[in-house]
UniProtKB/Swiss-Prot annotation:
Keywords tagged on the record: Allosteric enzyme, Cytoplasm, Hydrolase, Metal-binding, Protease, Sodium, Threonine protease
InterPro entries per the UniProt record, alphabetical: ATP-dep_Prtase_HsIV_su, Ntn_hydrolases_N, Proteasome_sua/b, Proteasome_suB-type
This protein's record includes keyword Cell cycle: no
Binding, Na(+): A162, C165, T168
Gene designation per UniProt: hslV
Name of the featured protein: ATP-dependent protease subunit HslV
Gene Ontology molecular-function annotations: metal ion binding; threonine-type endopeptidase activity
Keyword Transcription regulation listed: no
Length: 181
């Protein structure tokens, strides 16, 4: 069976805001199966935003697990991410899930992988998915050379990625939180 693939998720932190945005395209092989999937959402009573790249069903399973870890650890993003990564790597069923998560709260931004990695970006941005490198390059240029807001940078960088990556469309979901940095 062909795998569902491709997406672009981008997170930017700037001027007291953290924004995660993603496109809405779900592709299977060379066919667009859905154009308006919601790959970015709010968790933990709206205090955390998260985006996923990879299998949709896998991502929803991981969102549920991550939210339960947030509840268990009183909203501590880093602790919840580490605990999810440990489970994801060691659980026989979870280990088969194919997705990447980007998560952010007011203090931190992280990428969580199925290999057990929890990665905090060195700069104010992170990107995943098939169009992630295009969006990241565009966002980096915009961060360094403009005074645009985090939201505008996400919008413009996702648009650039959609112009380049065939697995990324222009139907964006964007969530924003106030940030301490």
């Amino acid at each position: 069976m062909k795998q569902f693939r491709g997406t672009t998720i981008l997170s930017v932190r700037r001027n007291g805001k953290v924004v995660i945005g993603g496109d809405g395209q779900v592709s299977m092989g060379s066919t667009i199966m859905k154009a308006n999937a919601r790959k970015v959402r709010r968790l933990y009573n709206g205090k955390v935003i998260a985006g996923f790249a990879g299998g949709t069903a896998d991502a929803f399973t991981l969102f549920e697990r991550f939210e339960s870890k947030l509840e268990k650890h009183s909203g501590n993003l880093t602790r919840a991410a580490v605990e999810l990564a440990k489970d994801w790597r060691t659980d026989r069923i979870l280990r088969r899930l194919e997705a990447l998560l980007t998560v952010a709260d007011s203090k931190a931004s992280l990428i969580i992988t199925g290999l057990g990695d929890v990665i905090e970006p060195e700069q104010s941005l992170m990107a995943i998915g098939s169009g992630g490198s295009f969006a990241q390059a565009a966002a980096k240029a915009l961060l360094e050379n403009t005074k645009l807001s985090a939201r505008k940078i996400v919008e413009k960088a996702l648009t650039i990625a959609a112009d380049i990556c065939i697995y990324t469309n222009l139907n964006f979901t964007i969530e924003e939180l106030d940030s301490e940095s």
